[in-house]
A protein has these predicted regions:
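Pore-lining transmembrane helices
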Residues: 1-178
């Protein structure tokens, strides 16, 4: 794995996760698509970064009560979390947008960092995806699929755990109020 490919993957993952299907994401996609269709560079970092934030936020709604002993989201976010994970498996990152809209100054950088760490883990450990699709039906085309999934999980777990502890800290400080059932 060359240094240039590592830098490209890092930038690609960050720009892909930044706005979840928005213009920065689309610009990154056009560049990546050009490289992958010409067989210059694989699109692995992008396909991992597309699904990582949505899986991470969905996961956070499943583990919050086990991790910190309380809800850290309003009730509607628990359903949105399940939807977010389902959409991620379909290759759609926009399921994480409602979470980003609530606290964008924290959540968006978290998406970027978690996606970069997950994508770089997959890339450095040898996952390789040339087909420009992040949905589960394209996963059989991934070289080293186990490592690819590991990269997604690493990034998603980072996003989930950090977000749960961040929100729990806000609750403790009285900066976030969640109705307990």
């Amino acid at each position: 794995t060359s240094t240039a490919y590592i830098v490209y993957s890092l930038v690609l993952a960050g720009t892909t996760a930044f706005d979840l299907g928005g213009p920065v994401n689309k610009a990154a996609g056009f560049v990546a698509l050009g490289f992958t269709t010409e067989k210059i560079l694989p699109i692995t970092a992008r396909t991992i970064a597309i699904v990582t934030p949505s899986i991470g936020l969905g996961l956070s709604t499943l583990i919050d009560r086990r991790l910190v002993g309380r809800k850290v989201y309003e009730d509607e976010f628990y359903e949105l979390g399940k939807t977010s994970m389902f959409l991620a498996i379909m290759g759609i990152s926009e399921g994480a947008i409602p979470f980003a809209l609530e606290r964008p100054s924290f959540t968006i950088p978290l998406y970027v960092v978690g996606s970069i760490i997950g994508a770089m883990s997959g890339v450095i450990l040898g996952a390789e995806q040339w087909f420009p699709e992040s949905a589960i039906w394209a996963w059989p085309l991934v070289k080293n699929l186990g490592v690819y999934i590991l990269g997604i999980l690493i990034g998603a777990v980072i996003i989930a755990v950090v977000n749960v502890y961040y929100r729990n800290n806000l609750i403790k400080k009285g900066k976030l109020v969640i109705d307990e059932d």
